[in-house]
Amino acid sequence: MTTLKLYLEDSDLSEATAKIVELINGEQGIIRLDRTIFHAQGGGQKSDIGLIDNILVTHASHSDNYVDHYVADFGNLEVGQEVNISIDLNNRLIHAKHHVAGHLIAALIEKRFPDLQATGGHHWPGQARVEFSGTLPPIEKVQESLKSDLAEAIFEDIPVQVKGDPYGSRKIAIGDFPAVSCGGTHPKSLGTLREVEVTKIKSQKGVLRVSYSVAN
């Protein structure tokens, strides 16, 4: 048995129905469903929050082939029951915007500075950053080019698309930039971002770290 992750196919899906397959007691209750729209924390992106019927889901995480939905209590929920599930759409959008902004920064820097390669990203609000390795250019040069390149890409409202099998070889493509493997959620185009600010660029021990924030 596995949880079908509907958000992999449609990041805009905010409501659905699902069947409860397991209830796990513990310090926090865990609800497992046959399918979900809740993005499980991972890949540098925070978890969705929302409701299973009227029960508040405060966190979602991967566990083997399941997505575990964390709750304070189960209320009257039972295994086998069909439930309505919904996510906090504003919360989803905040994290989707931060995630795609990280991809955009990686794509722009790799295009402008081919000797650099993105090696990781953390897309949490207030902590968002992308790290690169390779031949490090002057920080001032990166700062100047990235600011203008970000503004141009957002102004052009470049489309963001899912490529490949959403449940297999899923990739995210921003316009004509190379598609990258990703299991996160993203807006349909860059215009949603409005503004991405590069808050800090740091170079240390062969690693370039670009920290950023996204306008609400």
Model-assigned labels for residue ranges:
Residues M1-N216:
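Active-/binding-site microenvironments in catalytic and ligand-binding cores
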